[in-house]
């Protein structure tokens, strides 16, 4: 159970509450222990001629009072300690979530979402049970055992020694079953993670499941996983089911021995009837801790297994870390330089980017084209430091990216990824995500930093949410105006106005109630709304028809003016006006230059353009075709 040591920092802020709760544990046991002793005095007093009826009545009243005070102390014991464990659970879950946001993209590429969800829910619950009820009953069991045993020895040391003979084999039973329960519970949690992952994937990919008629196959897979989960739980039930009866057998044996030997003690006059009755009450109080011990051990073992699973995530350090003394960004010009940059994904040997070198001048538009799998998206993902190069370096305005705070770097970059992601909030909040005036609820935002230094998490969230300060270019004066202006550039404003609630339309999960093109335009508007110094469009218009694409590109000319931009597109016609075009093939820059320069070389770029023009001509049924630098181009408006 050494894993639970890492829970100590979470207990320290509540040490006063825990101390008060544990004092209630001791107090409740004092009152409970007093009851049998008062009963002994009353019974023994029945044969004493000097005792009056009022004396017996007074003892009876004290017994009732002790029971009431013991019950009140137990109530506050549970109220304080269980309430504290709930707060500890909330703190642990918050830290777990903050830590997840600190981790780099590579971590999530190798970790199942369902597994993380299981740790954030089931495992934190198991840790709470160990931090609250298990601690409470462990102390209660220890105190009750100590008080009861002390009074039993005081009544009759010999009877106590005989009655406790069955307890000799208790420690090895507890240790042995404790290890079994720990192992079984960890296996259950691992299987629950697998089960959660499958449910999450099926809910997310429900359209694919139905499109490929995979319902029955997925049901069979789920049934198999669920059956395995059930079998693992049944194995734990069997272990616990054997553990508790063994404890009951030991305690029952102790009671039988006490009745037999204690009866002889009364007959021989060594103890009184009151002593005998009180002894059996104390033995019963001793029996409950023995029975509860199995439950407490089970809770601690489950909590230990779950804390171990949480620790494996909490102890994972992000590969992308801010430098100790980061260089501040002032008046970003946007000059980007790649110097012999190579990259391979963690855990792989194949380089997907190989020796790439180029310079993007401040305010220039750089296009990246190439066949599928050539490394285009990977190349631009290195700019906001989603990954770090395996070799070489990237500079922003002459400063290596590794010398910059990643949060500050990302605050000046607007990125439109290939996969459009929208939150289950209003369109206004989605588009305004990076504007800097936080909505009622910061959508999925966080600093991604665990507040170990006692800082205010909400301030960290604001820092990760949007750029701030006088040195950040284009800080918005009005959030709504910026949102709507960005939507106009993305050709989405008029569409939004047709919705009954306009910008206040609440989106479904991942924006499912929008079309693919509308989702792409919304993510484009989100990037534009924050007015970044550097804009990255990763195939951002692939789901948009050519007519809408042409209008967006026309409006983007004004939006891109004065800012460095990187455009990835599978349509070569969308990047012909770029200041520099990079042609990637198998991770290498095989050509670079302007549109005219690359056409003149009749290389890979010219081949890609000819192929696409032919495809557009065939799709358009031989529609309008014009000559562009000696290459036939299908009209964007055709």
What annotation goes with each model-predicted range?
Residues 2-3, 11, 43, 77, ...:
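Juxtamembrane loop-to-helix connectors within ABC transporter transmembrane domains
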Residues 13, 17-27, 133-188, 257-271:
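Transmembrane helices of ABC transporter permease
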Residues 13, 105-106, 122-131, 135, ...:
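An intracellular "coupling" helix at the cytosolic face of ABC transporter transmembrane type-1 domains
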Residues 18-73, 80, 153-158, 267-273:
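Transmembrane helix-loop-helix hairpins at lipid-water interfaces of multipass membrane proteins
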Residues 63-70, 74, 167-171, 240-254, ...:
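Hydrophobic alpha-helical segments in the permease module
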Residues 86, 94-118, 122-124, 197-221, ...:
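Short intracellular "coupling" helices and adjacent cytoplasmic loop segments at the cytosolic face
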Residues 204, 214, 238, 286-313:
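Cytosolic ends of transmembrane helices, especially the final helix of ABC transmembrane type-1 domains
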Residues 323, 329-440, 444, 456-463, ...:
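ABC-type nucleotide-binding domain
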